[in-house]
UniProtKB/Swiss-Prot annotation:
Primary residence: membrane
Nucleotide-binding listed as a keyword: no
Record's subcellular location: Cell inner membrane
E.C. no: 2.7.8.13
Name assigned to this protein: Phospho-N-acetylmuramoyl-pentapeptide-transferase
CDD domains attached to this UniProt entry: GT_MraY
Alphabetical keyword list: Cell cycle, Cell division, Cell inner membrane, Cell membrane, Cell shape, Cell wall biogenesis/degradation, Magnesium, Membrane, Metal-binding, Peptidoglycan synthesis, Transferase, Transmembrane, Transmembrane helix
One Gene Ontology molecular-function label: UDP-N-acetylmuramoyl-L-alanyl-D-glutamyl-meso-2,6-diaminopimelyl-D-alanyl-D-alanine:undecaprenyl-phosphate transferase activity
GO cellular component, one term: plasma membrane
Family of the protein in this entry: Belongs to the glycosyltransferase 4 family. MraY subfamily.
């Protein structure tokens, strides 16, 4: 929004031209989202407490989690508000890249809100019925997939980028829609499964978003994209604003979500942020890289799949409890140890993912 105002004011004072630089607006976007989260966080937590919107803890969960019962939840609203305000202020609202991610955040955030509402108000620990949740996610993801396929403006927008191989970029054709669908829905649910300990999901989300900010900048710059053998995506640089807004809002939220948490993000936050990461990965054509950098999310999801599959096929469990972070809790690891070690793994995987940009 302010981009257009600055563009108009440039004719009176050339100093306003600084707002045309993506990097400058990205910094302001990060700071805006973070300051908003830090400022509004205490007010929102107090309001949630008054409204008795507290976490509902499963009776079959780890005993250490029983003390979390009643902790304010649905704090993801704080993150989403920070991202939206920041992007609307500093982003180029003429960019379809920006609106795609905002649409994903809004729709998946709404799905998560409905899920949280059922848990908190109706005291139903299962929340929204799984098939309805999956159906709503599927509709939203397919809308985005079809739109991106139909509106593709260059061959690079529907290619598959394979890390480590600079000459392998196959055109996906109609399979593009399938890939987009599974990337967005899968990423959304993976982050949701990871959000089981204080700060466990938000920090890897911040790291991956920061990495995608760099990748979006490189992909939107013709010289950098050519040098690194990335698809050149004109306008993709505006995704940097979205990514840094997620980083800023996420760090601001972490201030209150770090152990012991004062507030949880709830499904309204985890489903939306996961879907947003998936959408960003699709937009910059780095779905495989998301699997690498978001390895912690993948690990959590695979642990659930293996646990359920093993129990149904053999009647035995592989882990003491899934997702896998609960397994380590039941092994006696203190919660902060599990969280920080998963953060370290996430940092390593993000750096590995960034290294693949050069290792081609």
């Amino acid at each position: 929004m302010l981009v257009y105002l600055a563009e108009y004011l440039t004719q009176f004072y050339t100093g306003f031209n600084v707002f045309s630089y993506v990097t400058f607006r990205a910094i302001l976007g990060l700071m805006t989202a973070m300051v908003f989260s830090l400022w509004w966080g205490p007010k929102m937590i107090a309001r949630l407490q008054v409204m008795q919107i507290g976490q509902v803890v499963r009776n079959d969960g780890p005993e250490s989690h029983f003390s979390k019962r009643g902790t304010p939840t649905m704090g993801g609203i704080l993150i989403l508000a920070g991202v939206f305000i920041s992007v609307l202020l500093w982003g180029d609202l003429g960019s379809r890249y920006v609106w795609v991610v905002l649409f994903v955040l809004a729709t998946f955030g709404l799905i998560g809100f409905i899920d949280d509402y059922r848990k908190v108000v109706r005291k139903d620990t299962k929340g929204l019925i799984a098939r309805w949740k999956y159906l709503l996610q599927s509709v939203a993801a397919l809308v985005i997939a079809v739109y991106l396929y139909a509106s593709a403006q260059s061959p690079g927008e529907t290619q598959l980028v394979v890390p480590f191989f600079k000459d392998i970029m196959p055109q996906l054709g109609g399979f593009f829609i399938v890939l987009v669908y599974f990337t967005i829905v899968g990423s959304s649910n993976a982050v949701n499964l990871t959000d089981g300990l204080d700060g466990l999901a938000i920090m890897p989300t911040v790291m991956v978003a920061a990495a995608f900010a760099l990748i979006a900048y490189l992909s939107g710059h013709v010289q950098f994209a050519s040098y690194l053998h990335l698809p050149y995506l004109p306008g993709a640089g505006e995704l940097v604003i979205v990514c840094t807004a997620i980083v800023g809002a996420g760090l601001g939220f972490l201030w209150f979500n770090t152990y012991p948490a004062q507030v949880f993000m709830g499904d309204v936050g985890s489903l939306a942020l996961g879907a947003a990461l998936g959408a960003i990965a699709v937009l910059v054509r780095q779905e495989i890289l998301l699997v690498i950098m978001g390895g912690v999310f993948v690990m959590e999801t695979v642990s659930v799949i293996l646990q359920v599959g093993s129990y149904k096929l053999r009647g035995q469990r592989i882990f003491r409890m899934a997702p896998i972070h609960h397994h380590y809790e039941l092994k006696g690891w203190p919660e902060p140890r599990v969280i920080v070690r998963f953060w370290i793994i996430s940092l390593f995987l993000v750096l590995l993912g960034l290294a693949t940009l050069k290792l081609r």
